[in-house]
A protein has these predicted regions:
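Intrinsic-disorder/low-complexity, polar/charged segments enriched in Ser/Thr/Lys/Arg/Asp/Glu/Gln
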Residues: 3-7, 46, 57, 70, ...
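Hydrophobic/aromatic beta-strand elements that line small-molecule binding cavities or substrate pockets
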Residues: 7-9, 58-64, 85-93
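A short, structured loop/turn motif at beta-sheet edges
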Residues: 13-16, 63-69, 90-99
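Hydrophobic pocket/interface hotspot
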Residues: 18-19, 28, 47-49, 62, ...
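Glycine-rich portal/gate segments that line the openings of hydrophobic small-molecule binding cavities
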Residues: 30, 36-77
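Beta-strand/loop substructures that line and gate deep hydrophobic ligand-binding cavities in soluble
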Residues: 78-123, 128-130, 139-140
């Protein structure tokens, strides 16, 4: 199995705002994709995201939601390489910033798709950072 791990520091951002950016429709559409259906943050809820030129949606079931500190998703729909992977977000306060750690685990191997996803998450985290630090909505995938 192959796993990826990222960390980003968000200056002047509190953990509640970082959590909201990861768990609400308004938050996710502010930095990730403009097409997201986010019914809620209860365990069992399914987030559905669409991306340009993708023939399917990415469906993430909420497996854990600890306000302002941790979110876990299980990918139950999407490209074959994503299904069955887990996306885990840890959020903590560090002085005047929030620190967000992203772990995406359970990939079958380190192949080209894995490498592409690794770079993609780095780009998404920079979009998240810009959204939270400036308040300007600019989803990476906007259509």
């Amino acid at each position: 199995m192959a796993d990826m791990h990222h960390l980003i520091q968000l200056q002047g951002v509190d953990t509640a705002d970082a959590y909201a950016a990861l768990t609400t429709g308004d938050g996710i559409t502010g930095w990730w994709t403009s097409r997201a259906d986010v019914p809620g943050t209860d365990v069992g809820d399914v987030l559905t995201m669409s991306f340009p030129d993708a023939p399917m949606t990415w469906d993430m079931r909420v497996d854990r939601a600890d306000p302002s500190s941790r979110v876990e998703w299980d990918c139950i729909g999407g490209p074959p390489g994503w299904k069955g992977t887990r996306v885990m977000w840890d959020i903590e306060s560090a002085g005047d910033q929030a620190v967000v750690r992203l772990d995406h685990t359970g990939f079958a191997s380190v192949d080209d798709m894995f490498r592409t996803v690794t770079v993609g998450w780095a780009q998404m985290l920079l979009s998240l950072k810009a959204y939270l630090e400036t308040g300007a909505r600019a989803p990476f995938f906007d259509f």
